[in-house]
Structures are given as C-alpha cells and as structure tokens.
Amino acid sequence: MGFPKVERLLINYKTLDEFKKFKGCGAQELSMLEELQANIIENNSESPFYGIYYGGSLIARMSLYMKRNGGEPFEITGTYLELYKLEVLPTFQKQGFGEMLVNYAKGLQFPIKTIARIHSAGFWDKLNFQPVSVPDGDFYVWHPETNLNAVTNEESA
C-alpha cells in the first residue's frame, strides 16, 4: 500500500457511501452528505471535494471552492479559495491528514479563507492562518508567500 495522497473525489455513489462513514462522527455543520447528493442530482462533474484514502477507504475530506472577492470586507482581493469544510475520521485524527489536505490547498497558490469550527483555532494558527474579524463573523486567512527570488521574463531579458 502506497503513502496516502490527496485526490479530487469523484461525484458518484461510491463517494456518497464513503461520506456516510463520516455521518455521526463530527458536527452536523461539517456534513457534506447533502452537498454531495445535490451535486449528483445536478450531474456536476467538477467536484469541489478532495480527500485522502487509506487502505481503500476515505479517511479525510474537505470541500474547496474557487471564489472571487466582490467587495466583501476582508483582507483578500481577487480570486481565492474557500476551504469550506475539513474533517478527518476520529481514528485517523492527529496523524497529519488534516494538515495534508490544507497543504494541498496551499499548493494551489491562492489565498485561502476558512472558518474555524469545533475548537479548531489552534489547528489554523499552527498552519500560519491569520484570524480576521468582520461584522459578519470571524474566520481565518492564509496568503501564499511571494517568492522574492523569482525572476520574471522582463528581468531575465
């Protein structure tokens, strides 16, 4: 068995069955079952769901949406990712799988916005997310680091 990796989840009935394993493990607000069912009904082929399989079973998952700031009062301008929900099955928690999912999202090199749910503020702090407070509520933001050593085409000419 190879090392687990993050992969985009297919929108199908197999994934729906895998999501049912998470029902009752976490908070209702983290449930993605209804979200997946809606995507199956709409025959949406662009899955917003990502997960980690271990031993053939889904053990961790997140939903990730591409958004564009349309004047909302927070620190992100332009295109960003909203990491809407992240959940790891209890048996596999505190083994780095949640961090693997977040690092996958970070690797896409867009700012990320997320809401800290279920006493997870320490997790987001550890992963260098910054807390942001606005009238609508609190959330966390991560910005990709600018590579100061990058050379543009104009500079190299």
From Swiss-Prot:
Signal peptide coordinates: none
Protein name per UniProt: Uncharacterized N-acetyltransferase BCAH187_A3974
An example molecular function term from Gene Ontology annotations: acyltransferase activity, transferring groups other than amino-acyl groups
InterPro entries: Acyl_CoA_acyltransferase (IPR016181), GNAT_dom (IPR000182), YlbP (IPR017274)
HAMAP family (UniProt xref): Acetyltransf_YlbP
Pfam families cross-referenced by the UniProt entry: Acetyltransf_1
SUPFAM superfamilies: Acyl-CoA N-acyltransferases (Nat)
EC number(s) given by UniProt: 2.3.1.-
Native species: Bacillus cereus (strain AH187)
UniProtKB keywords: Acyltransferase, Transferase
Top EC category: transferase
Gene3D superfamilies: 3.40.630.30
Domain N-acetyltransferase: 9-146
Top-level taxon of origin: Bacteria
